[in-house]
A protein has these predicted regions:
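C-terminal outer-membrane/trafficking sorting elements
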Residues: 303-311, 315-378
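Carboxylate-rich, polar loop motifs that coordinate divalent cations or form catalytic acidic clusters
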Residues: 1-302
Length: 378
């Protein structure tokens, strides 16, 4: 089986499934044996497996970018394929699959839109039905029952048969090409794009962008994994693997730590807290992530950590900003992104902001790649 691993599903006890560009493999921790499935010896619909999902019956659903969807029945030990055709999938370039609690399978595809499989029948939802784009890259369930779709036209929420988009122009995403969407334990949304990462609070719409503009990642962000202590483990294509501590400080994980791959697709924790990392060079298993955190945080961070202060907040006649980068641009906007004022910090990264003429209410102070909520009172 090939070394390029795109996804992994971990089971209690150490067994797991792996999606690769050469098929699908299963590791049985009890027997300590591997079993691989391909088109030739397993009857898969394709070879380039992208994502995996387990349904309530224990069946494995696999998305293939070169064919469609294959479903494995562990009792029968056989695969069932869903390909392209009338009443089937619209295209074979499937990018993701997820099965909800009711057993409905949701499938995203590149150029074919969104598809759902229920009661042994496929239904396709495309631009003609209001989908902003037919080129989708992934699917993530929301806590409110909605579906979030990664796409070439931003992050798309599908709820109640309606679509709502988060985009670069309106919602200040780093890029409209969204590769993945994840939710942290605190409910924050992590939007992975081709030019960086946005962390967004969906309740307040406050956000922070991490990308080329603040020196972090200048290329493709694939995935974010969250550990129990608030640290984030960021997988990047061409840029490798990063640790983002709960304090927001970044460390590059590289050859010093024994990590050599440049293309990292995703990472997942098992029930023991061990981290399995899918890369272009196989699976790397980090048995004790805490020890690596301790080692990295005892060294200089990859990027400086800036502490920015906005006070007073709430404010009436003025507020002051401290801790920004020297001569950083500051914009005062409405919550909808309408620009009200544009200013510049001094050489020390400080700025006094007069609020004369600003109607009492809630606004955003956008400083570089970060947005801070400012409450203007009477």
């Amino acid at each position: 089986m090939g070394n390029v691993c795109k996804d992994i599903l971990l089971s209690n006890g150490g067994s797991f499934w792996v999606a690769t560009t050469s098929g699908i493999s299963h590791y049985d921790a009890t027997d300590k044996k591997w079993k691989s499935f391909t088109q030739a010896n397993g009857g898969l619909i394709g070879l380039n497996a992208r994502r995996l999902s387990l349904d309530a019956k224990g069946q494995l659903w696999a998305a293939f970018y070169d064919g469609g969807v294959s479903v494995y029945n562990p009792t029968m030990e056989m695969w069932t394929n869903h390909g392209v055709g009338e009443g089937k999938l619209p295209v074979g370039t499937v990018t993701d699959v997820w099965v909800d609690a009711e057993g409905v399978a949701w499938v995203t595809s590149f150029s074919g839109g969104l598809a759902k499989y229920a009661n042994n029948k496929w239904e396709t939802i495309k631009q003609e039905q209001g989908l902003p784009t037919n080129s989708l890259l992934g699917i993530t369930p929301g806590a409110d029952g909605s579906l979030w779709l990664s796409s070439v036209a931003g992050a798309i929420q599908y709820k109640g048969d309606k679509f709502t988009s988060l985009t670069k122009s309106v919602n200040k995403l780093p890029d409209d090409n969204v590769r993945n969407i994840l939710f942290a334990p605190d409910g924050s949304m992590y939007i992975c794009t081709n030019t960086g990462l946005q962390v967004r609070n969906l309740t307040t719409n406050e956000y922070t962008n991490y990308g080329a503009s603040n020196g972090f990642i200048s290329s493709y962000v694939n995935h974010v994994a969250f550990d129990a202590k608030g640290n984030r483990w960021i997988s990047c294509w061409t840029e490798g693997f990063y640790l983002m501590t709960k304090e927001g400080v970044f460390y590059k994980i590289g050859t010093t730590e024994g990590f050599t791959p440049t293309d990292v697709y995703m990472a997942r924790f098992n029930e023991k807290g061990e981290l399995y990392v899918c890369t272009n060079d196989g699976i790397f298993i980090l048995k004790n992530p805490d020890s690596l955190v301790q080692k990295l945080t005892s060294t200089e961070p990859t990027l400086p950590s800036h502490s920015l202060i906005v006070a007073p907040n709430p404010a009436s006649s003025y507020t002051e900003l401290q801790g920004a980068n020297a001569s950083a641009e500051v914009r005062l906007t409405t919550l909808d992104g309408v620009l009200l004022r544009k200013m510049q910090c001094d050489a020390l990264g400080a700025l006094r902001i007069g609020l004369e003429g600003i109607t009492p209410g809630t606004y955003f102070l956008v400083v570089g790649s970060k947005a801070y909520r400012l409450l203007v009172s009477e």
